[in-house]
Amino acid sequence: MARYTEAVCRLCRREGMKLYLKGDRCYTDKCAISKRTYAPGQHGQSRKKLSNYGLQLREKQKAKRFYGVLESQFRKYFEIADKQAGITGENLLRLLETRLDNVAYRLGFGSSRAEARQLVVHGHFTVNGKKVDIPSYLVSAGDTIAVAEKSKSSAKFKALAENAKGNTPNWLTVDVEKLEGKVVALPSREDIDLEIAENLIVELYSK
């Protein structure tokens, strides 16, 4: 599957915010955007005022990069969100947030979404007792996500979960000893810590 090949720290600088793409490094002084808050490139320090379309595009790019989703799949999520009842922008973020790779990351079973995605692909997780190796798999309220039995002997997962303890969002619970978590409810907009104007994404795709 196609993925971003650009240095991920440049992506954060381009969007002007931390996208938490490098795991633990993002929480240290080594984070690139902590050192250089301007965009990469020769003219990065002279940001131009964006047009309305430019603002809409930037918000879309933020969301895509935050969750590590490429354009074709992102558009499919929008089409699904647009058909659901409720507010389209919030529906879109909820779909992205309930991807298995993101949930594994939120539970602390990956230091970044990229690492969690790789671990999902390699078959390290189960959903309701069945192995799922599709990062885009959407979890539902009541689902139990666990580290597969064959992987529980790895000290890596316990260390990751211990480090993430206390940072689990309200819509999830995690049992560090059992290396499993549960989706207690679908996330509301207040549960999603992405600083983004999702209404601008809706406007962009609605043209």
Curated annotation (Swiss-Prot):
Gene Ontology biological process terms from the UniProt entry: ribosomal small subunit biogenesis; translation
A GO cellular component annotation in the UniProt record: small ribosomal subunit
Entry keyword rRNA-binding: yes
Taxonomy, superkingdom: Bacteria
CDD domains assigned: S4 (cd00165)
Signal peptide limits: none
SMART domains: Ribosomal_S4, S4
Domain S4 RNA-binding: residue ranges: 98-158
HAMAP family: Ribosomal_uS4_B (MF_01306_B)
Subunit structure: Part of the 30S ribosomal subunit. Contacts protein S5. The interaction surface between S4 and S5 is involved in control of translational fidelity.
Family to which this protein belongs: Belongs to the universal ribosomal protein uS4 family.
Full protein name: Small ribosomal subunit protein uS4A
Organism of provenance: Alkaliphilus oremlandii (strain OhILAs)
Gene that specifies this protein: rpsD1
